[in-house]
């Protein structure tokens, strides 16, 4: 019996959330409704300008682990934070949420903990300004083989592919998990990330992973086609389990050649 159902690896980002007006966004030069990557000085200026801010541990894979933990599953997260106020907050929040944060905050690091300043407008639109900070340095030295071998599944975040050290960390975690009988997979995260690293993505999926999760745009991007069915078939040829989310069309799952299409129920949002 392994200790963890799922071990994830990804960007450890503190979400800093504040209500804001369109006037404020214009004054601060924030483009409404999109996510932008920003530098340290810009991050500090926006953080200081936020009023009544609320903080939460975030990051794509970390959020998934939080959901799994809420279902009662044992989870752990491989991430990198600095030993600063936000880093200590992040590590504590993950632990209190039921997910083991296996990497202690890094002392004397030259980059601060990653944060995403999220400005929520009255119409519900979110404007995100993300500074990656120390998360961009996550590498194989942060991967504990003993933790990986205690995982039934490891879950990788595609966003880390923009750094060579992130790719190396992926392979390290995947191989350690699979060598102990576990399974490894990835959430592709972003079609533009695939565009930048297509060959590496395909090599990882075919040779190092047991499952892949992506939306229709991400799956199509893997094989540079506008035909989703063609992309799904080709992905299924190199990976035994493919999960494709298709928005209002539902979810398509292909497991060892057998396909199931799961429909969605249409509802009216509570704030519509």
Outline where the language-model segments fall.
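A glycine-rich helix N-cap at a beta->alpha junction
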Residues: 93-110
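Glycine-centered short loops/turns at secondary-structure junctions
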Residues: 72, 98, 179-181
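Conserved phosphate-binding/catalytic region of the ribokinase-like
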Residues: 1-7, 12, 26-32, 37, ...
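Hydrophobic beta-strand scaffold residues
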Residues: 75, 101, 184-185, 242
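Conserved beta-alpha-beta core of the PfkB/ribokinase-like small-molecule kinase fold
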Residues: 153-233, 249-251
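Glycine-rich phosphate/adenosyl-contacting loop at the front of the ribokinase-like
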Residues: 1-78, 88-89, 263, 268-270
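Cofactor-binding loop segments of dinucleotide-utilizing enzymes, especially the Rossmann-like FAD-
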Residues: 9-11, 80-83, 120-122, 131, ...
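Conserved phosphate-binding/catalytic loop of the ribokinase/pfkB sugar-kinase fold
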Residues: 102-107, 118-164
């Amino acid at each position: 019996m392994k200790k963890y159902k799922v071990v994830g690896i990804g960007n450890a980002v503190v979400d800093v959330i504040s209500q804001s007006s369109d006037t404020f966004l214009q004054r601060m030069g924030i483009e409404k409704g999109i996510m932008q990557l920003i530098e340290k000085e810009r991050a500090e200026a926006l953080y200081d300008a936020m009023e009544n801010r609320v903080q939460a541990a975030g990051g794509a894979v970390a959020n998934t682990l939080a959901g799994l933990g809420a279902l009662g599953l044992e989870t752990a997260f491989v991430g990198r934070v600095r030993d600063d106020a936000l880093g200590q907050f992040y590590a504590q929040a993950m632990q209190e949420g039921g997910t083991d944060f296996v990497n202690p905050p890094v002392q004397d690091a030259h980059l601060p903990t990653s944060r995403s300043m999220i400005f929520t407008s009255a119409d519900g639109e979110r404007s995100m300004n993300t500074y990656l900070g120390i998360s961009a340095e996550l590498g194989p030295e942060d991967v504990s083989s003993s933790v990986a071998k205690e995982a039934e599944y490891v879950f990788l975040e595609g966003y880390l592919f923009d750094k060579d050290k992130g790719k190396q960390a992926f392979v390290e975690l995947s191989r350690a998990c699979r060598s102990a009988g576990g399974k490894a997979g990835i959430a592709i995260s972003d079609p533009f990330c695939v565009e930048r690293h297509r060959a590496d993505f395909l090599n990882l999926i075919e040779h190092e992973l047991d499952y892949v999760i992506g939306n229709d745009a991400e799956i199509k991007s893997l094989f540079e086609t506008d035909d989703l069915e063609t992309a799904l078939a080709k992905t299924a040829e190199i990976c035994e389990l493919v999960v494709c989310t298709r928005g209002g069309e539902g979810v398509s799952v292909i497991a060892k050649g057998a396909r199931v299409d799961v429909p969605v129920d249409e509802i009216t949002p509570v704030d519509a």
